[in-house]
Regions:
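Flavin (FAD/FMN)-binding glycine-rich loop and adjacent Rossmann-like elements that form
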Residues: 1-2, 6-173
């Protein structure tokens, strides 16, 4: 019989004892050129979106006490743009070195710290006068997962399948 586990983290497959993997395999295992030279246990992190709105009038912002000081913790290769929101802030990510199945709540709180801290910086640093009339309209509360368990089956989809657009009769990996 065929079954599709669409629970999100493969809960049904995991509880049934199905073999799975987490993290990236080495380049050598499947001959994937873009894979890392050696396997590692880190995963892609979780993301939370947030949206801003221009109210047309000045709006003050007071960050919650748990907001992160992003001037000390966000890598310097990133910059902030007061007009960016939602999908343009995809890089607001955290949790790749944690257990993305079981630590989602902890990851969510860290993401909130970053988001509220980033908005505090945008609103109150004085570097973004265009943000004076903007408000933080909405902040997500369920992190978007980018990676979790990958179950092993009769066939495992590899990089070449995607790049070469290989056809598979069952269209399932």
């Amino acid at each position: 019989p065929l079954f599709c586990d669409a629970s999100g983290d493969g809960v049904v497959g995991f509880l049934s004892g199905a073999p799975y993997r987490m993290g990236a395999e080495s380049r050598e295992e499947f001959g994937e050129k873009f894979a890392p030279a050696e396997d590692y246990g880190e995963l892609l992190g979780h993301s939370l979106y947030f949206y801003t709105k221009d109210t047309g009038k000045p709006v003050k912002y007071v960050a919650p006490s748990y907001a992160m000081d992003v001037t000390k913790t966000v890598p310097r290769f990133r910059s902030f743009n007061a007009k960016e929101h939602g999908c343009k802030l995809w890089w607001v990510e955290y949790g790749g070195d944690l257990d993305t199945v079981h630590d989602t709540e902890q990851i969510k709180w860290e993401l909130w710290k970053v988001i509220y801290g980033a908005w505090d910086y945008i609103k109150n640093s004085g570097k973004y006068p265009e943000a004076e009339t903007m408000t933080l309209e909405w902040v997500g509360c369920i992190p978007g997962k980018r990676e979790s368990r990958r179950f092993e089956g009769d066939y495992m989809l590899i990089q070449q399948d995607v790049i070469e657009q290989r056809h598979h009769e069952d269209a399932v990996s």
